[in-house]
Amino acid sequence: MENKGFELVSTYKPTGDQPRAIQELIEGLEQNKKSQVLLGVTGSGKTFTIANVIKAANRPVLLLSHNKTLASQLYSELKDFFPNNRVEYFVSYFDYYRPEAYMPNTDTYIDKTTKSNWDLEEMRMSTLNSISTKRDTIVVASVASIYGALKPKEYWSAFYNISIAQKISRKEFLLDLVQRGYKRNNVASEPGSFNAKGDFVDIIPAWTKGFHIRVEFFGDEIEKISTIDSNNKITIEKFKEYLIFPASAYTAPTGTIEAAVLRIREELHQRLEYFEKEGKLLEKQRLEDRTRNDLESLEEFGFCPGIENYSRHVDGRAEGEQPFTLFDYLPNDALLIIDESHMMIPQLNGMYNGDRARKLNLVNYGFRLPSALDNRPLQFHEFEKYEFQKIYISATPSDYEINQAHGEIVKQIIRPTGLLDPLIEIRREQNQVEDMFDEIQKQKAKKQRTLILATTKKVSEELTRYFQEKKEKVAYIHSDYTTFERNEILRKLRKGVYDTVIGINLLREGIDLPEVSLIMVLDANKESFFRSKKSLIQIVGRAARNVNGRVIFYANNISKSMEETIYDNLDKRKIQMDYNKKHNIIPKTIIKPITEAIEDKKLNESLISFMSHSKTKKSIKEKEALVKDLRNQMLDASKQLNFERAAELRDIILELEAN
């Protein structure tokens, strides 16, 4: 396996708590600590710290993020830090996914509906290839990493190494390509295809659009191997030998499929006998028809729709045996980094139960064989069995992560900008509405923005109405808003179109509002998920991008969560102030450009108009034109590695198509 080492490229130097955090984490790895926790406040440069640890550790890395938006941001940042190494992106390749399900109470069967994104599938394949062949690889992945994948040995067995002067006929070579999932296509250059003309064979990889592979023959011998630029057809590089990867991440040898078909037939026979014995003739007929159709496709094409439901048989696993995942492609000394671990760990823990509950209905009512239950994500105890060294990252790590690290926490409290954690003030609930109104006036005078967090939709709506009647520029964000509408309100807040935004949960990922210097929290003492210590600390952190950051808790008494949050805040502020005083640092508000998700002004106006009149009938052509333009912008954003914008555009497109 190739290993040229990680090369960190940056104009930054570690500052504040970063040097100490980097050193402690590296020492922990060298001491073979199984788990470490990095507690880093918002804006403290945790990604840069981790980049330095990756460089020093010099081993393959899997970094888990709990959603695609944050994963894309991390991927983009790490690509910038490591331009000369492999940085890969592994998330679900579905732009839209509605899983197969059956609801017995209404006798409703819902077939699986998906919309695949080939760019994401290409990146997933690139991930498998890089992690299999290069040690200087970083993979940024979502929860998709714990879902089933082809058995690594099956995938690796399809790797095809060729070299100049290799004795092989052109016909044999083409047959070898077909066995690895490639399809002949002399008309169009589609990923995972090849075209053969004369002595030339051009292979179109499924893992990149940048080039295709040209193999030239002289008789029954390979004469030349080169990569050709896909756009200008110029030769990029010539090779003495070349490793060709399979055409698909699910390419299985012919013998494997044949063996799987035999096992599927045997299971089908047993299940049909069971339904016959139980008198469930409808379920028996349904299962027999569906499965025999799948078997015919498998025998003829080596593939069938929903082949993943037979993955246990394709892999040769026993009933209940753990599925293979991306984790099984990693070497034993890989480093596992879990970002926003307070969110990621519960997500990993919850995937299996939801998946199994849905599939049990499909099995019980004859839509799937029982083996479909083994097409599943990892159970949490299976995830824990992997013995990779782990680093958990969070501003609010949970007890689980802290216990895994035996109570040891690496803290990163100092921000490179010198910004302090916001001041917290407690005010009584009496006359709180009038008090908030007065605070908004002060904020307006300073040209600074405000967030108000309520606990119920009713209170949020009443507050919004009250302030609007007072002629205040106030907006309310609620769960019914689309991604586009929500983001548009936050952009208008930053621009000053609104002075205040009211909501229940404004802590969703990706919110970065430097103009917000005041957050007012209603019912701060009402213990709940949104008023827990972790949530309150996250709320306070949202005002930490502004030098004048403040938070007001409205409460008639102090809850335990409030008390712990305030003590945490005071401790951090003291550390930060002492550091700034010692190093003569003057805190400065973060400057962040306000960008439009939709860069074309006319397109932006059309979309706003379309969304605002979504209840009226719009022409299909108008919507199709909007979607086409948005998709072009999304692809451009992806090419420019602006994955945050690309993900936002993707969500807007899906909402438009569902409208």
Curated annotation (Swiss-Prot):
Domain UVR positions: 624-659
Presence of the UniProt keyword DNA damage in the record: yes
Keywords of the record: ATP-binding, Cytoplasm, DNA damage, DNA excision, DNA repair, Excision nuclease, Nucleotide-binding, SOS response
Annotated compartments: Cytoplasm
Record has Hydrolase as a keyword: no
Residue interval(s) of motif Beta-hairpin: 93-116
Gene Ontology BP term (one): SOS response
Classification via InterPro entries: Helicase/UvrB_N, Helicase_ATP-bd, Helicase_C-like, P-loop_NTPase, UVR_dom, UVR_dom_sf, UvrB, UvrB_inter
Ranges for domain Helicase ATP-binding: 27-414
Cellular-component GO terms for this entry: cytoplasm; excinuclease repair complex
Residue intervals of the Helicase C-terminal domain: 432-594
One example GO MF annotation: ATP hydrolysis activity
SMART domains named in the record: DEXDc, HELICc
Domain of life: Bacteria
Binding residues for ATP: G40, V41, T42, G43, S44, G45, K46, T47
Family: Belongs to the UvrB family.
Subunit structure: Forms a heterotetramer with UvrA during the search for lesions. Interacts with UvrC in an incision complex.
HAMAP family found in the cross-reference section: UvrB (MF_00204)
Domain topic, free-text comment: The beta-hairpin motif is involved in DNA binding.
Function noted in UniProt: The UvrABC repair system catalyzes the recognition and processing of DNA lesions. A damage recognition complex composed of 2 UvrA and 2 UvrB subunits scans DNA for abnormalities. Upon binding of the UvrA(2)B(2) complex to a putative damaged site, the DNA wraps around one UvrB monomer. DNA wrap is dependent on ATP binding by UvrB and probably causes local melting of the DNA helix, facilitating insertion of UvrB beta-hairpin between the DNA strands. Then UvrB probes one DNA strand for the presence of a lesion.
Stated name of the protein: UvrABC system protein B
Organism phylogeny: Bacteria, Bacillati, Mycoplasmatota, Mycoplasmoidales, Metamycoplasmataceae
Gene: uvrB
